[in-house]
Amino acid sequence: MPVRQLPEQIVNRIAAGEVVERPASAVKELVENAIDAGGTRIDIFTEGGGRRRIVITDDGSGMTQGDLALAVERHATSKLDDEDLLRIRTLGFRGEALPSISSVAKLAITTRHAAEPHAWAVEVDAGAKSAIAPAALQRGTRVEVSDLFYATPARLKFLKTDRTEAEAIREVVRRLAMARPDIAFTLAGEERAPVTWAAALPGAPGRLTRLGDILGSDFRTHAIEVGSEREGVSVEGFAAAPSLTRANALGQYLFVNGRPVRDKLILGAVRAAYADYLPRDRHPIVALFVTLDPQEVDANVHPAKTEVRFRNAGLVRALIVHALKDGLAREGRRTAANTNGAAITTAFRTEGFSREGFARESLPRGGYDWRSSPAAPWPPQAAAQAPAMGFDESAQAAFDAGAPSADTRGNEAPLGDALGRPLGAARTQIHENYIVAQTNDGLILVDQHAAHERIVYERLKASLTKNGVARQMLLIPEIVEMDEASVEKLLARASELEKYGLSIESFGPGAVAVRETPALLGKANAASLLRDLAEHMAEWDEALPLERRLMHVAATMACHGSVRSGRILKVEEMNALLREMEATPNSGQCNHGRPTYVELKLADIEKLFGRR
């Protein structure tokens, strides 16, 4: 077959296939045009998942009669000069959206420029353009797309259900609305109830308001403001505290110079920043806004402009990691401690409570009377778990695995100056797992296992980066039996385990010999530790960087080397744990993202008893 020139109509349809993949693609292109036109209010309406009808109305600058005639021609644009290709500052710039859409659908445009006495309208049906005629419209532009892809029936076969396509449109509009909180958006259609996002105030508060409206009130409550800047590149935005996560990565939003984009390298930076806070199966919720010189980023990588290429991707990644880690560390204590007093009050409120119906004699058996005892006691028991390791020397003697915890019944917990410390003074332990501490203005509840797990984890990391992890040699190597596949996984990573002081070697089929363990873990159960490590290694991606693999190893070791639930602690031990928490970075959350402590203010306690 000889080479021949394709007809213009076919060329347009090929271009449409690249730019307009589905109704959501058309909505994206049209809304971006409305934003570029300076619109302060943009209304979107759809029918049939956008397949039957899409209507976009804005109050932007509009077009003159001459501009309207060119707008439906290929590669005609008002957003690009000869020398601007490397300095793209607008969302749409190729001049492809309108002609591409009109080549596969019915397109009607009505627009009015401030300099025109009235509006102008044009219709395009599968590439066939009508004459431009006068019309009625306030300043701005109204674009209506009907029967999308009717001129390319093959494309219709690949569209999903109306509900699925409508959801894709909603996600596109959500992202654009997050990028521009200064613009009011309305999304309506037969598939959904109308949603309106009012224009927000400029700055971080307005941005958080818009993000909260879209991502939910939980995000607004748990949001941490983050930011970092270097060499002309700035990263700003909000990230949810580790206590608010998702089962997938769909809650991670990235915007570059106001453009919603997807970038695997940058989102990998988000995972790295949260690695010390979240388990492997949970994902953070973030909205990050990167601003840099347009010459430093290529927005022309993808026909739909959903991907970008950075000239210095390493710098952008480093700034994102720094911004997130700094924000998480800075707000760690606040996000862990600030339990909503109103929520606690509601949880404890009893309907129908009456003062007459609650006499002192009605205390349940075992109820505690503050008049008869100066401090809350716990029953004397033998410590059944391994010793707690990692405290300072002043409290180390208290952790003797073979000795029972002392009976402190009736002993007053020493207060001294500890009441003024962030985590206060330990008063008692409840349910053999939670420490109750008193502060000057309330009380603190600490999960002893979660708190010590974070302390051990941070110490393991610090040891690795300094002089190496201290080891303890076993007098008699411990032989651990497991399936051959698990043994192979462990032996394949033996050099990595060695970095953390865990020395293993083969002991025949289906067994390994443990010769050394990290000193920080004390008398940890080596068999249980190795089995957990083998299970976690089975889930590792082979491409996972060595640093991340080592962090996973440290997290698993920390869990096994921590004070266990059910271990009775003396007051000295509890206070030692509180002081260690205050000196440990990221101690507000355990390695799995759960809070290590919560705080209840005195004002909230008084509300529980009707004193406020």
UniProtKB/Swiss-Prot annotation:
User: What keywords does the record list, in alphabetical order?
Assistant: DNA damage, DNA repair
Task: List S-S links within the chain.
Answer: none
Q: Does the keyword Electron transport apply?
A: no
GO molecular function terms attached to this record:
ATP binding; ATP hydrolysis activity; ATP-dependent DNA damage sensor activity; mismatched DNA binding
Q: Which InterPro entries match?
A: DNA_mismatch_repair_CS (IPR014762), DNA_mismatch_repair_MutL (IPR020667), DNA_mismatch_S5_2-like (IPR013507), HATPase_C_sf (IPR036890), MutL/Mlh/PMS (IPR002099), MutL/Mlh/Pms-like (IPR038973), MutL_C (IPR014790), MutL_C_dimsub (IPR042120)
Annotated GO biological processes are: mismatch repair
Record family assignment: Belongs to the DNA mismatch repair MutL/HexB family.
**PANTHER family, sorted:** DNA MISMATCH REPAIR PROTEIN MLH, PMS, MUTL, DNA MISMATCH REPAIR PROTEIN MLH1
Name this polypeptide is given: DNA mismatch repair protein MutL
Q: Whose protein is this, by species? A: Afipia carboxidovorans (strain ATCC 49405 / DSM 1227 / KCTC 32145 / OM5)
